[in-house]
């Protein structure tokens, strides 16, 4: 919104021209989301404690987690609020891609909020019934997928970018909608599964968002997109502002979520952040790149699928506990060691993903 205001004020003072620069708005978007998150943190934590909205800890989980009982949850509210305000302030409101991401962010946030509310307020350990959770996730994802398809039909915006191959960019047609659906819903639930230790999910989210910010900048620039042999997508550049807002809000949340956590993000945060990352990757035509950069989320999800599948088919478990971060805890790794090592792996995967843009 401030961009529009600056465009009207530039005739009175040329300094307002700085608002037209994407790099400037990306930086202030990060800082705005960061400061908002840091400001809201203590207030939200105190409010959640007053309402006794605390994390539910599984009795069959690692014993070290029992001390987490009573820690406030639903801290994702500060993340979503910070991102939304920052994006509305610094992104061009006429950009349809920005609204697509915000729609998924807020929509999945509402689904996660209802799930958390049922768990911690109504004391329903199952939360939102699984079929209803997937139903609303699907409705939101399909609504955005069809909208994005209508905006970019038969353009590079609906092509598929394949890592390592510069000349393979097939036009997906309606398959675009199906792919977008699975990426958005899948990433949302993958981040949700990863959110099991203090700071474990938020830092890989920050790393991936930072990586996608660089990709968005290149994808929205015709010269760089041509140089890297990736699809040039007309509205993609403005997603840099969205990505940096996620980075800022995530770092602000980490201030309170680092071990030992003062607050957990809850499903309201993890479902929304995962959905937003998936949506951004689809808009940038970098679904395969997200698979690489978000490798930690992928492995966490696969560990659950393999564990459940193995137990149903063979009656045996592959891991001591799934998702896989609990497996390492039960092997005797201290929680901070698991967290930091997963962070390091996540950073490496983001860098490898970015390198694939050039290795073609």
From Swiss-Prot:
This protein's GO CC annotations: plasma membrane
Lineage: Bacteria, Pseudomonadati, Pseudomonadota, Gammaproteobacteria, Enterobacterales
Catalytic activity: UDP-N-acetyl-alpha-D-muramoyl-L-alanyl-gamma-D-glutamyl-meso-2,6-diaminopimeloyl-D-alanyl-D-alanine + di-trans,octa-cis-undecaprenyl phosphate = di-trans,octa-cis-undecaprenyl diphospho-N-acetyl-alpha-D-muramoyl-L-alanyl-D-glutamyl-meso-2,6-diaminopimeloyl-D-alanyl-D-alanine + UMP
GO terms for MF: metal ion binding; phospho-N-acetylmuramoyl-pentapeptide-transferase activity; UDP-N-acetylmuramoyl-L-alanyl-D-glutamyl-meso-2,6-diaminopimelyl-D-alanyl-D-alanine:undecaprenyl-phosphate transferase activity
Cofactor requirements of the protein: Mg(2+)
Listed name of the protein: Phospho-N-acetylmuramoyl-pentapeptide-transferase
Top EC class, one word: transferase
Cleavable signal peptide: none
TM spans (from-to): 27-47, 72-92, 94-114, 132-152, 168-188, 199-219, 235-255, 263-283, 288-308, 338-358
GO biological process, one term: regulation of cell shape
Subcellular location: Cell inner membrane
Job description of the protein: Catalyzes the initial step of the lipid cycle reactions in the biosynthesis of the cell wall peptidoglycan: transfers peptidoglycan precursor phospho-MurNAc-pentapeptide from UDP-MurNAc-pentapeptide onto the lipid carrier undecaprenyl phosphate, yielding undecaprenyl-pyrophosphoryl-MurNAc-pentapeptide, known as lipid I.
Family label: Belongs to the glycosyltransferase 4 family. MraY subfamily.
One Pfam family it belongs to: MraY_sig1
Recorded metabolic or biological pathway in which this protein acts: Cell wall biogenesis; peptidoglycan biosynthesis
Keywords recorded for this protein, A-Z: Cell cycle, Cell division, Cell inner membrane, Cell membrane, Cell shape, Cell wall biogenesis/degradation, Magnesium, Membrane, Metal-binding, Peptidoglycan synthesis, Transferase, Transmembrane, Transmembrane helix
